[in-house]
Amino acid sequence: AITREPIKKAGEAKELEAVAEVIYGGFDNDPFQEKTYINTADGKERLVLFPARRNGTISGVAIKTSTNKGFGGKMELIVGFFLDGTVSGYKVIHSNETPGLGTKISEPRFKEQFAGIRPKKHLFKVKQDGGEIDAVTAATISSRAVIDAIQKAYDAYNKFSTGI
């Protein structure tokens, strides 16, 4: 019980650092203090939504999302969005992917494919599945998992953005 609070604080610091990394242009509020929860489209999960503000106006949103479709099981990401729903970036905050293979989902060469796109199901798949995303070599399952998590976040963002 003595270690629970420091572990929680370390996790929050890691999440806030990830939010800062995926929100283009920064923010002047504390997105962690303003966080809210939003249900996934199927209603089975609650995602954490961090609004980023500049001069009191929402300038972007970061969403903590997850998937159980990783090669190593559960994977958690923070995904950033511009107000038009375009992905600004993502950061993996937890995964059990294979070192040197699945962990390449965190490398710029793979991540850069997502920046500036608005996910649409018909193209938001790895090329092996008829989409436009180059999977990490020998880590197609991990690549698909990232897409699944980002798609969940995107669907939640679209639900949230109707209220902006």
Question: Model regions: which residues?
Answer:
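Flexible, solvent-exposed loop/hinge segments and secondary-structure transition points
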Residues: A1-I164
